[in-house]
Amino acid sequence: MRQKLVIGNWKMHGSLAANAALLEGIKAGAAKATLAVCAPFPYLAQCQALLNGSQVAWGAQDVSAEARGAFTGEVSASMVGEFGCTYVLVGHSERRTYHGETDQTVAAKALRALEFGIVPVVCVGETLAQREAGETEAVVGRQLQAVLDALTVEQLSRVVLAYEPVWAIGTGKTATSEQAQAVHAFLRGQVAARDAGVAERMAILYGGSVKPDNAAELFSMTDIDGGLIGGASLKSADFLAIGNA
């Protein structure tokens, strides 16, 4: 039985004061799922200070594909690791769309995170046009395959996947539980072709307008192991409610 995992993605939101209130609220609650928050880089030290010793993990929203060097503005996995990060998001659709990240770049970032003991949360997903054209499996399959090709089975065993239909992020639209389950099952099957044991243990999260009122139905699906939560992760009550769905 896979333990549910709920990760909050704050995106480019937050302030020292607001974060403190949010994190204290999350810490004060309890959840059935494992909880984590992925904060902007400047707030990782604050997360470490406030969450260290708690049941809530923390992580970053991106990491460089490079280990070190003359890469102005980049943040390396070793730097992120110094702030106690458990997770790092790689390949979020907003990074792919706005920063031109390729499948190969995403795979390189996942590999770099693993080298420094950080769990990469590899995000895959299709646009509305791709879904309507019947290309969902081809698109997410290609995105996942780049990662499968770059990692050993042992490395793959330390990866979390997240399916985030681009058309359901921040739009208020949500994939039906059946639509989401179908893609999750497809992704697990693709991992199983590489290693069945890894596939059975791998957490595959759903991201796309998850809220307290739809989380339970989504999380009841066989291959949905939790959520990657955007807007609802900025309110402690909503985030905890999802963690208890």
Swiss-Prot record:
Family: Belongs to the triosephosphate isomerase family.
Compartments in which it is found: Cytoplasm
Enzyme Commission number(s): 5.3.1.1
HAMAP family recorded: TIM_B (MF_00147_B)
Name of the featured protein: Triosephosphate isomerase
Residues spanning the signal sequence: none
Any one cellular-component term (Gene Ontology): cytosol
PANTHER family assigned to the protein according to its UniProt record, in alphabetical order: TRIOSEPHOSPHATE ISOMERASE (PTHR21139:SF42)
Single annotated GO MF: triose-phosphate isomerase activity
Catalytic reaction list: D-glyceraldehyde 3-phosphate = dihydroxyacetone phosphate
Disulfide-bonded cysteines: none
Binding site for substrate: N9, W10, K11, G170, S209, G230, G231
Function: Involved in the gluconeogenesis. Catalyzes stereospecifically the conversion of dihydroxyacetone phosphate (DHAP) to D-glyceraldehyde-3-phosphate (G3P).
Annotated keywords: Cytoplasm, Gluconeogenesis, Glycolysis, Isomerase
Subunit structure, interactors included: Homodimer.
Pathway assigned to this chain's UniProt record: Carbohydrate biosynthesis; gluconeogenesis; Carbohydrate degradation; glycolysis; D-glyceraldehyde 3-phosphate from glycerone phosphate: step 1/1
Active site positions: H92 (electrophile), E164 (proton acceptor)
Spans traversing the lipid bilayer: none
InterPro entries in alphabetical order: Aldolase_TIM, TIM_sf, TrioseP_Isoase_bac/euk, Triosephosphate_isomerase, Triosephosphate_isomerase_AS
